[in-house]
Amino acid sequence: MEVSVIGNPQARICRAELAYRELGFRFGSDVISGESRNRVSFCNQSSKWKEIAIRCSSRSVKCEAIVSDDASPFLKSTPKSKSLESVKLFVGLPLDTVSDCNNVNHLKAITAGLKALKLLGVEGIELPIFWGVVEKEAAGKYEWSGYLAVAEIVKKVGLKLHASLSFHGSKQTEIGLPDWVAKIGDAEPGIYFTDRYGQQYKDCLSFAVDDVPVLDGKTPMEVYRGFCESFKSAFADYMGNTITGITLGLGPDGELKYPSHQHNAKLSGAGEFQCYDKHMLSALKGYAESTGNPLWGLGGPHDAPAYDQQPNSSSFFSDGGSWESQYGDFFLSWYSSLLTSHADRVLSVASSAFSGIGVPLCGKLPLLHQWHKLRSHPSELTAGFYSSNGQDRYEAIAEIFAKNSCRMIIPGMDLSDEHQSPESLSSPESLLGHIKTSCKKQGVVVSGQNSSTPVPGGFERIVENLKDENVGIDLFTYQRMGALFFSPEHFHAFTVFVRNLSQFELSSDDQASEAEVEAETASIGSGTGAPSLQTA
């Protein structure tokens, strides 16, 4: 086997007389390919960049670096600032990398993609691990085979792995909560978040049942602890060497929030309060009685807008509206306190379960920037982020992260105010700055992510955020691999982005002769070689 590439100076030589295998990038029904049947192209034919030639077999993932002077525009970059030198770049694997049947999806494409990312200088890969896949059939019955297979591939390629433990479901991938949990939910729907219309959110358990034995006699926290301990045992050989970080799912989509924008509601709306399952209502009733206001414990605000309605469509979020009243402070303080307590419980469980392994723990917050310019911050309130009486909710949450020695992941670092619609009164830059400042005050290390959909000027905005000297960001995860990621236009932009974060200066020891380069490109062009990857 022989792999010839232009790029990573750390690549080393491995040759063997093995049959070549065609590689393609297929994600779902999409195929990214070049002109000929044995070529995979990441850019159009007018590209000025030197192509990356890859020959490989199923029995090896090692590679050989071949460099020519013509490749210098790709390999060399201007000196980067000190703030970028310590940033590690990761890329997220597809959410459905492992199916709900524990099979690894699009294995060949992912393996080839990992090699390409390694050659670009990417540090590692983020792997979403779903509770509903691993503990699918019965409580305490764990099946890690699919995820272990991915970890082994990542290790062989020479990348690092960041594991995201997801205690939520995903409609996008049709991966739900474990089957045995869903059966309990069918009999006892009160375990799910519920809105005022009685609609349930079945991709995450209600925060109000955290310490209630609703799962075959166990509490969700006890079940999560068992999951974490099983993960630690199953992946013991990878801890600290291949696995260099673990993220704990804190709510819907893995983020610390209420599912306030569920049921395909438009993000332009204010969202809905999720406090109508029986356990939330019971907690609200008890809190109201303890404060001497029993009538306030009958339900959520009656004058709040619906999911996709603008905040000014009713009086609750208006200036001088109910949110500023004594009742509003009572309800919002209670609602947000449950969110904060949930974060503390999950992170405490994880901190205890993973004690002593030397791998950093992380949790993720949402960037709820819609309507942030309004005094009431409606999208943040319905999701559980309420600040009042001198207490900043983000700072309170950062304090909990610090208490549990946990790092905070903040998404949306590719977003700018400039590209938001004026009608939404959105300000991702302001909110992001506020959260980062809260983390700095509490000594919490920040990691970054981009939003799920590419936006204009996104890569440039990410670089600006990573250069922020006030809040050091140690790791950035770009979301997410797939057909769009490897499309010519996007992969070109991603390559330039990586170049801006890394220096690709090679020593003379790493360089190969022009004859070797010509031999490689000639074999590709003749059609007798292996598939090629072109990058721009």
Swiss-Prot record:
Q: Does the keyword Cytoplasm apply?
A: yes
Indicate where this protein resides in the cell: Cytoplasm
Source taxon at top rank: Eukaryota
Tissue distribution: Mostly expressed in young floral buds, flowers and roots, and, to a later extent, in stems and leaves.
Q: Where are the stretches annotated Disordered?
A: 511-536
Task: Name residues in a coiled coil.
Answer: none
List residues modified as Phosphoserine: 47
A Pfam family (short name) is Glyco_hydro_14
> Biological process (GO) annotations?
polysaccharide catabolic process
- Protein name as it appears in the record: Inactive beta-amylase 9
Q: Which gene encodes it?
A: BAM9
